[in-house]
Amino acid sequence: LMARRPIFINLGRGLCVDEEALVDALDAGKLRAFGADVLYDETPDLASNKLVGRDNVIITPHSAFYSTTAIEDLERLSCENIVHFLKGEKEKVFKLVNEV
């Protein structure tokens, strides 16, 4: 069971969140606050987005992961994935989304 008026944080995929339902939950007081690094649309119209401008909503510009360590890990993981894929070691490829 969720706590009363939980804080919802989405650091994953914007497509996972029904923004209209989220706005309704915030308006109804079912959620205390919302934080996100990504919205449903990768290039949202912030002027018309109903989440923007609320005191209980924080949205970062899809950049929360940027750090020296994160970039180094991303570069290393990308290279390892290419090597594993070319060797036919699909089971070792991290987060293989679409098989070829």
Ranges and model annotations:
Residues 5-7, 11-100:
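Rossmann-like dinucleotide-binding domain for NAD(H)/NADP(H)
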